[in-house]
Amino acid sequence: MSLTHQDVARIAKLARINVSEAEIAATADQLNNIFGLIEKMQAVDTAGIEPMAHPQDVSLRLRDDVVTEPNRREAFQAVAPQVEKGLFLVPKVIE
């Protein structure tokens, strides 16, 4: 697949991007190079190769679930403008 200058101009128009004629030519060349690379990659036979989530086979180390901060709820609610039954009260903003 290759894009023509008209294709790039149409895509730019649809995307509402102002592109000069010089930029259209350069962009068409760049996109066609990308499409060529994609065609080369698709030509590679990958049958029998298992997909990878990451290029390196690394297992994640899990850490213990430990509380690292003290419970300061009462201190925060002591300085709050309004609190009711342990909940912060805020003004209604949407009717």
UniProtKB/Swiss-Prot annotation:
- Pfam families (UniProt xref): GatC (PF02686)
Which transformation does this protein catalyse, written as a reaction? L-glutamyl-tRNA(Gln) + L-glutamine + ATP + H2O = L-glutaminyl-tRNA(Gln) + L-glutamate + ADP + phosphate + H(+); L-aspartyl-tRNA(Asn) + L-glutamine + ATP + H2O = L-asparaginyl-tRNA(Asn) + L-glutamate + ADP + phosphate + 2 H(+)
Keyword Metal-binding set for record: no
Which Gene3D superfamilies does the record associate with it? Glu-tRNAGln amidotransferase C subunit, N-terminal domain (1.10.20.60)
Any single biological process term in GO: glutaminyl-tRNAGln biosynthesis via transamidation
Q: Print the keywords alphabetically.
A: ATP-binding, Ligase, Nucleotide-binding, Protein biosynthesis
An annotated Gene Ontology molecular function: glutaminyl-tRNA synthase (glutamine-hydrolyzing) activity
Q: What is its EC number?
A: 6.3.5.-
Q: Which InterPro entries match?
A: Asp/Glu-ADT_sf_sub_c, GatC
- Residues annotated as coiled-coil are none
Q: Does the keyword Kinase apply?
A: no
Root EC class: ligase
Briefly, what is this protein's role?
A: Allows the formation of correctly charged Asn-tRNA(Asn) or Gln-tRNA(Gln) through the transamidation of misacylated Asp-tRNA(Asn) or Glu-tRNA(Gln) in organisms which lack either or both of asparaginyl-tRNA or glutaminyl-tRNA synthetases. The reaction takes place in the presence of glutamine and ATP through an activated phospho-Asp-tRNA(Asn) or phospho-Glu-tRNA(Gln).
Its subunit composition reads: Heterotrimer of A, B and C subunits.
Q: Which family does it belong to?
A: Belongs to the GatC family.
Please report the name of this protein according to its UniProt entry: Aspartyl/glutamyl-tRNA(Asn/Gln) amidotransferase subunit C
